[in-house]
């Protein structure tokens, strides 16, 4: 009888610990994966380059993707209904829903222009908004990214250098339109 009582107490304690642990884990906000401090070198005109130093920066934070020249990584989307509710960093591009490549190709406008390539590996079209900082300009620019078709790739070009590009407001779109499906 005493053994049954001890066994019951042990089971109750284990369950209480498991529930407490699960509540603690779900209550903790997700900490973004950070890239180490780095120096970015960008070509700003035909003959000149500039360096920009950044402290630790997230790859993804609060459903926004932070890109710098030379980046190539993926994200996963959590979709509920027809809405993107979460964007998370995925370093393994083979497991990512979207893969981003951001670069300053030498062959574009004397190496000054920027190119963003997006590979969409999900079964829905995706669109997003961009905001970026241009060296020497005080204000950030805003842009809409053309919808990337399901299972396809798309490339966006800008004729100027971009020190940092932030992508946000990820939306699923219906065929032939950039507005979210309701």
Regions found by a protein language model. Give the residues of each.
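Intrinsically disordered, low-complexity segments enriched in small/polar residues
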Residues: 23-114, 125-127, 131-182
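Bacterial N-terminal signal peptides that target proteins for export
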Residues: 1-8
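Sec/Tat signal peptide C-region and signal peptidase I cleavage site
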Residues: 18-22
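Bacterial N-terminal signal peptides
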Residues: 8-16
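Short, well-ordered beta-strand segments enriched in hydrophobic/aromatic residues
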Residues: 114-120
């Amino acid at each position: 009888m005493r053994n049954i009582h001890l066994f019951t107490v042990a089971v109750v304690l284990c369950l209480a610990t498991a529930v407490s642990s699960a509540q603690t884990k779900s209550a903790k906000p997700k900490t973004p994966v950070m890239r180490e401090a780095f120096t970015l070198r960008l070509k700003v005109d035909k003959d000149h380059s500039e360096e920009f130093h950044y402290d630790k920066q997230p790859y993804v934070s609060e459903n926004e993707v932070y890109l710098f020249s030379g980046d190539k990584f993926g994200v996963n989307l959590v979709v509920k209904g027809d809405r993107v509710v979460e964007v998370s960093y995925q370093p393994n591009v083979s497991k990512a829903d979207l893969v981003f490549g951001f670069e300053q190709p030498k062959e574009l406008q004397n190496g000054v222009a920027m190119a963003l390539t997006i590979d969409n590996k999900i079964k829905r079209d995706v669109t997003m908004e961009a905001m970026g900082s241009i060296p020497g300009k005080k204000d950030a620019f805003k842009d809409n990214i053309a919808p990337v078709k399901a299972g396809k790739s798309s490339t966006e070009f800008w004729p100027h250098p971009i020190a940092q590009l932030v992508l946000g407001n990820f939306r699923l779109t219906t065929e032939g339109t950039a507005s979210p499906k309701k």
